[in-house]
């Protein structure tokens, strides 16, 4: 049985991975790799509607992949480095496991 912290970590990774499953969200993530953005920036650069962007932002926020900060009436979004580190750590563990694993017939 999984330890509780391990189970929570896997649930978090699962949510994060789902957030990568849409090409529009990947496009939004690419924009955030250059720094924080507001919805109006995303609209200009992607030609997506405000409602569609808000939908994708909601999914990215719920997954913990992005954070936001409000400045006056504007909300700026940026990537959550802790979540990116969690994904990187998990993928690294997968590659380490597969490279160190012995084949069944060896």
Language model: regions and residue ranges:
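Juxtamembrane/interface motifs at transmembrane-helix termini
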Residues: 48-51, 63, 75, 97, ...
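Residue-level detector of secondary-structure transition/capping positions
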Residues: 36-37, 61, 92-95
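Alpha-helical residues within the helix-turn-helix
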Residues: 44, 55, 61-62
């Amino acid at each position: 049985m999984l330890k509780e912290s391990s189970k929570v970590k896997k649930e978090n990774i699962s949510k994060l991975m789902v957030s990568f499953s849409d090409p529009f969200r990947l496009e939004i993530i690419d924009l955030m790799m250059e720094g924080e953005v507001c919805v109006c920036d995303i609209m200009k650069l992607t030609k997506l509607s405000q409602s569609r962007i808000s939908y994708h932002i909601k999914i990215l926020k719920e997954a913990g992949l992005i954070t936001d900060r409000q400045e006056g009436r504007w909300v700026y979004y940026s990537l959550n480095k802790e979540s990116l580190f969690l994904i990187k750590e998990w993928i690294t563990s997968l590659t380490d496991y597969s490279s160190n694993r012995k084949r069944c017939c060896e």
